[in-house]
């Protein structure tokens, strides 16, 4: 008699293996343990394999730890817990819950306002807010996390409750009554009809949960309600509860959108704060997600319909809600991309990052890197001033020899933060992996610290040319090493492949690209003569091409004059230069009769534009300075400290004993921050050095420092550019700052 075939042996072996396996489900409470035991028994009686066992944990966090330690295998978690489990313990989501076929494995967190109001997402500070409950996903975690992550809400020392209580002009946050900020966070709550249960995280508080938070808005207690996408439609147009005392119409409410606009309440797919992922079953990275789904799929096939002996998606028999799975679950589905990032999604991940601040992990000090004796003195005074106001974390001052030395010390975890300019931000990010935590903001009219780099030409229809046709033209530059006059335009032309330096000889390459130029310089040694060919010197013809005002074509005004007087065909200047010297703004004889409409800009796309269209037609925007830190530093804590500090010390006329943005008391300039700074600002979505600097500025820097410098052929479009900085060239010829 022949034995079993190979295929049959494999099947028998697989059944033996599965029969010997078990999935240990982690329960977080006695009622959940009870339901888990019943589910295990139901699965066993139905012959579902592998067998299901129940492990008792004390909380979701404890269960995650048990799974990571291989003492349990699976648990269903909400989005916030999935984020922590994935980020801290490497767990992965494998099975998702479905609640509503319209939105599938997710729902949407929205901010609702009355249509008659003028509130937007950018004007929430000071308004009255209605929340479903403390630490609830839609009513608290998403809106608060989003406001923090987007920079609208600053948090000092991880004290989110205080930050929210200071931000809104009163709130109802059911469950916040036991906190230190209950006066503000419970101010709008009213309890039940007899005034009992005020601010309880239960139905005793009339403004609790989704419908309660919306009622808080509808009755005029609050100005904005943070609820889910279906809440308004479930409580208006004839569905309003009689106890509310009024009939509500959905058309009387609108949603706040992330871009500052508003939309109808039916437009929640396009206008929301975040898509909230459904709960999901998580397991260790080495666990077969397909096996878990097959187990649960067999279970839901038998035990998710009415009349079945066990109800997987009901907790009514146990006197609780949402045990093992949410009671609103209609189906369990397999997750294709089993990473916590993919499951949670971009919007929700960003909101969670805004809340990821553990006071117990917050370092007591923020070590600031300083570069000079005056800066040490100012930093010391800043540390004392912050300490007196109990600002956290406290400041410590650590000296370094140079910006690059600061970067090295930050990377080595010897220092935490330093304020850097554009080129140094590039080096800090690309070479040392640092990221921006906060930025400087200057006055809108301050063109010396925040501006666009533009290429200006005469409006000439008969001899018009584009940026791609600059070879052989005559060029006017503010000076060698000036950001708008040299670094950005030359870098942009190199990056686009028009100028190709050989053996790092940028000067010769530029001199051969243009027919003639005026590029004033301090030290003309080994300087190509054509780069001075258009320069005119002073009125007596002396000091030709020197890197100061004795050369009439020096600086941005001088470069424009070079163009005006027909010495050059193109001038590389700031976007304000034309306006500063035309239409009567400059009374000097050469500029007195000039009109701005007689000039145009050359755009990177090959077009020309009016000089007023500089925001859309420029070579790059010079970025503001930024505070740079290690990527593991909580940037919201850094900004939270600076934001609270500038409320006290940011005004140069404040009476609090220290001026953050003024260096005059220390006999220096731009110490710790540029003196022109009006406010420190959050980085928002610009969380990388490339994001902060902007693509055009980075491209210009990479053009100046790329492999093209060594004579390599221009890369194909989209090819990476390798950094090879040119410190020797800059040190040899760099003139004073322009």
Swiss-Prot record:
The keyword Endoplasmic reticulum does not apply. Residues 1-19 form the signal peptide. Residues 710-738 form a propeptide. SUPFAM superfamilies: Periplasmic binding protein-like II. The modification Phosphoserine is found at residue 462. A lipid is attached at residue 709 (GPI-anchor amidated cysteine). Residues 23-357, 366-706 form the Transferrin-like domain. Pfam families: Transferrin (PF00405). Keywords: Cell membrane, Disulfide bond, Glycoprotein, GPI-anchor, Ion transport, Iron, Iron transport, Lipoprotein, Membrane, Metal-binding, Phosphoprotein, Repeat, Signal, Transport, Zinc. GO terms for biological process: iron ion transport; negative regulation of substrate adhesion-dependent cell spreading; positive regulation of extracellular matrix disassembly; positive regulation of plasminogen activation. Hydrogencarbonate binds at residues 132, 136, 138-139. GO terms for molecular function: iron ion binding. Disulfide bonds join 26-63, 36-54, 130-216, 172-189, 186-199, 257-271. It comes from the Eukaryota. Fe(3+) 1 binds at residues 78, 107, 210, 279. InterPro entries: Transferrin (IPR016357), Transferrin-like_dom (IPR001156), Transferrin_Fe_BS (IPR018195). Found predominantly in human melanomas and in certain fetal tissues; also found in liver, epithelium, umbilical chord, placenta and sweat gland ducts. Glycans are attached at residues 38, 135, 515. One of its GO terms (cellular component) is side of membrane. Residues 20-30 are annotated as: Antigenic epitope. Involved in iron cellular uptake. Seems to be internalized and then recycled back to the cell membrane. Binds a single atom of iron per subunit. Could also bind zinc. Belongs to the transferrin family. This is Melanotransferrin. It comes from Homo sapiens.
């Amino acid at each position: 008699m022949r034995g079993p075939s190979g295929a049959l042996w494999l099947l028998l072996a697989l059944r033996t293996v599965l029969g010997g396996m078990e999935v240990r489900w982690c329960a977080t409470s006695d009622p959940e343990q009870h339901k888990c035991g019943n589910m295990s028994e139901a699965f066993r009686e139905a012959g579902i394999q592998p067998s299901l066992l129940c492990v008792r944990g004390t909380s979701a966090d404890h269960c995650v730890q048990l799974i990571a330690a291989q003492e349990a295998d699976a648990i269903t978690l909400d989005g916030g817990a999935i984020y922590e489990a994935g980020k801290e313990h490497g767990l992965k989501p494998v099975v998702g819950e479905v609640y509503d076929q319209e939105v599938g494995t997710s729902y949407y967190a929205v901010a609702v306002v009355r249509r008659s109001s003028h509130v937007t997402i950018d004007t929430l500070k000071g308004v009255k807010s209605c929340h479903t409950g403390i630490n609830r996903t839609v009513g608290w975690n998403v809106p608060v996390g989003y406001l923090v992550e987007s920079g609208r809400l600053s948090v000092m020392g991880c004290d989110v409750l205080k930050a929210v209580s200071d931000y809104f002009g009163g709130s109802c946050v059911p469950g916040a009554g036991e906190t230190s900020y209950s006066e503000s966070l419970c101010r709008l709550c009213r309890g039940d009809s007899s005034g009992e249960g005020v601010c309880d995280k239960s139905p005793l508080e009339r403004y609790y949960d989704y419908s309660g938070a919306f009622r808080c808005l509808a009755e005029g207690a609050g100005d904005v309600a943070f609820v889910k996408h279906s809440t308004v439609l479930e409580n208006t147009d004839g569905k309003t509860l009689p106890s509310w005392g009024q009939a509500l119409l959905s058309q009387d409410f609108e949603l706040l959108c992330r871009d500052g606009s508003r939309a109808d309440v039916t437009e929640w797919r396009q206008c929301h704060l975040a898509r909230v992922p459904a709960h999901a079953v998580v397991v260790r990275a080495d666990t077969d997600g397909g096996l878990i789904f097959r187990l649960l799929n067999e279970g839901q096939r038998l035990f998710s319909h009415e009349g079945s002996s066990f109800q997987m998606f009901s907790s009514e028999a146990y006197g609780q809600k949402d045990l093992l799975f949410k009671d609103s679950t209609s189906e369990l589905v397999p997750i294709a991309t089993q990473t916590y990032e993919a499951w949670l999604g971009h919007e929700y991940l960003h909101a969670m990052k805004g809340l990821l601040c553990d006071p117990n992990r917050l370092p007591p000090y923020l070590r600031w890197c300083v570069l000079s004796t005056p800066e040490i003195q100012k930093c010391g005074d800043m540390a004392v001033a912050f300490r007196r106001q109990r600002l956290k974390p406290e400041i410590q001052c650590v000296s370094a020899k140079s910006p690059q030395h600061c970067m090295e010390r930050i990377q080595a975890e010897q220092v935490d933060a330093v304020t850097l300019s554009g080129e140094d931000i590039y080096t800090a990010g690309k070479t040392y992996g640092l990221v921006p935590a906060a930025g400087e903001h200057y006055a809108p009219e301050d063109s010396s610290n925040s501006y666009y780099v533009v290429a200006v030409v005469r409006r000439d229809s008969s001899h018009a040319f584009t940026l791609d046709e600059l070879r052989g033209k005559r060029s006017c530059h503010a000076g060698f090493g000036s950001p708008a006059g040299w670094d950005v335009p030359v870098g942009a032309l190199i990056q686009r492949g028009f100028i190709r330096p050989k053996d790092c000889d940028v000067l010769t390459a530029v001199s051969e690209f243009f027919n003639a130029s005026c590029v004033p310089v301090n030290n003309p040694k080994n300087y190509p003569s054509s780069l001075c060919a258009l320069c005119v010197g002073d009125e007596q013809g002396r000091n030709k091409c020197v890197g100061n005002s004795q050369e009439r074509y020096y600086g941005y005004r001088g470069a424009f004059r070079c163009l005006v007087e027909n010495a050059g065909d193109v001038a590389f200047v700031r976007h304000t230069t034309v306006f500063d010297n035309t239409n009567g703004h400059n009374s000097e004889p050469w500029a007195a009769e000039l009109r701005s409409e007689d000039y145009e800009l050359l755009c990177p796309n090959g077009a020309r534009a009016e000089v007023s269209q500089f925001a859309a037609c420029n070579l790059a925007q010079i970025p503001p300075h930024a505070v740079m830190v290690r990527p593991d530093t909580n940037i919201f804590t850094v900004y939270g400290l600076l934001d609270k500090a500038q409320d006290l010390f940011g005004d140069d006329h404040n009476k609090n004993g220290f001026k953050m943005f003024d260096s005059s008391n220390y006999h220096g300039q731009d110490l710790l921050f540029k003196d022109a700074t009006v406010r420190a600002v959050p980085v928002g979505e610009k969380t990388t050095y490339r994001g902060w600097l902007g693509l055009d500025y980075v491209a210009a820097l990479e053009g100046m420092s790329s492999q093209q410098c060594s004579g390599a052929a221009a890369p194909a479009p989209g090819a990476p550019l390798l950094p090879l900085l040119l410190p020797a060239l800059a040190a040899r010829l760099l003139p004073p700052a322009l």
